[in-house]
Amino acid sequence: MATIEYDRSIPSLSITFSNGAKRTYSDTDIFICFGLLRKEFSDITFLCKGSKINVYPSAMASQMSSGFVAYEVEMGDPEAKLVRIFDYEENELTNDVNEQILYRNKWAKSI
């Protein structure tokens, strides 16, 4: 079990495990911090929208929300759905932000 906490003012994201171990990630927004966390703990499945392969923030969404919201897209569909990255999700998850970027690029070409 672990607890994830954030600080919008920095922005930073911290994970604290039940054994007391703690790691903190700071970057330009919370989505990027979450990507760093997922990369380091790639053996853990994070059950949230921010881990879904077809979810990635736009620059504007990132700036306006500090990275807490992103767009969920579907191939061939120009409509993108705004989602909160820590909302529950269990399908099509990845810990590799590069896979999310590749999906986003393929989606852009599909519309």
Task: Give residue spans per PLM region.
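Long, contiguous binding/interaction regions
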Residues: M1-S14, R23-F41, T45-I111
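Glycine-centered tight beta-turn/hairpin loop motif at sheet-sheet or coil-to-beta transitions
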Residues: S18-G20
